[in-house]
Amino acid sequence: GCTSVIDHHASPAYIGGSLSTLRDAFLKVGLRAMTCFETTDRNNGIKELQEGVEENIRFARQIDEAKKAATEPYLVEAHIGAHAPFTVPDAGLEMLREAVKATGRGLHIHAAEDLYDVSHSHHWYGKDLLARLAQFDLIDNKTLVAHGLYLPKDDITLLNQRDAFLVHNARSNMNNHVGYNHHLSDIRNLALGTDGIGSDMFEEMKFAFFKHRDAGGPLWPDSFAKALTNGNELMSRNFGAKFGLLEAGYKADLTICDYNSPTPLLADNIAGHIAFGMGSGSVHSVMVNGVMVYEDRQFNFDCDSIYAQARKAAASMWRRMDALA
């Protein structure tokens, strides 16, 4: 049921060229996407960090050239990626600032997923986490901050003032046992994400709503349906196009559901239907950029060969993991 993927990629043993590999895959299946490389120093120090920044810049320039050539559908965009700030020293933030400035793209970063990220910023830099990023001009209306569970009040105010986005990843937070974000109702631009825990956004909205209620939160399904559809605004800001409505001038990206509703399905109650009834099993077809990429519950490419390759790669990975032990 997804028409677009916003990706935060990491492959420390394969940095240069990795984003182009992802772009090839997105174009093959016809998905719209925005991707970046997760810049960090946690595996190989400043060298790894510099290589990550360079890959982000290289890929953004590749996208610019592809747009000018206009020989392929404009389905893939670039962000400038960074891992949690506790693995990006000030020298790295300066590199990221230059990358954002040089490419005109926004920052995609995971922040305050754990309390350590915040305390590290206070201990080593004497600043709130997002205030530190803002010092390097890294918080603006194209910025995507994932998680943000432990952002202090001043950082939330800064996020809202700069018109940036916070992406809430309920299932990932539960899986990693990092806690709960009790400040969702304070966020101006809230969207939902998976952080790689599946790709089912129907399911993600259900978990986001029910976990919120379990934590004593005040929001109802309509707030989470709004967060679900806010992904369209994220895409609009970065693609320079309009998404999310069946109107002239909007991109023809849509999901068609075959949902036999037991009660009236109306604009006023569709959020409740998504929370309590409708799911990805209801998806009949998906259109991206006016092209059917999933029709009558069938993909238009060979899934079997992709799955076979994935199983082979998974087995190889586990053999390498066993060798480490």
Language model: regions and residue ranges:
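Glycine-enriched alpha-helix->loop->beta-strand junction motifs that scaffold or abut catalytic
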Residues: 30-32, 99-106, 138-141, 158-167, ...
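Metal-coordinating catalytic core of metallo-dependent amide/deamination hydrolases
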Residues: 9, 14-152
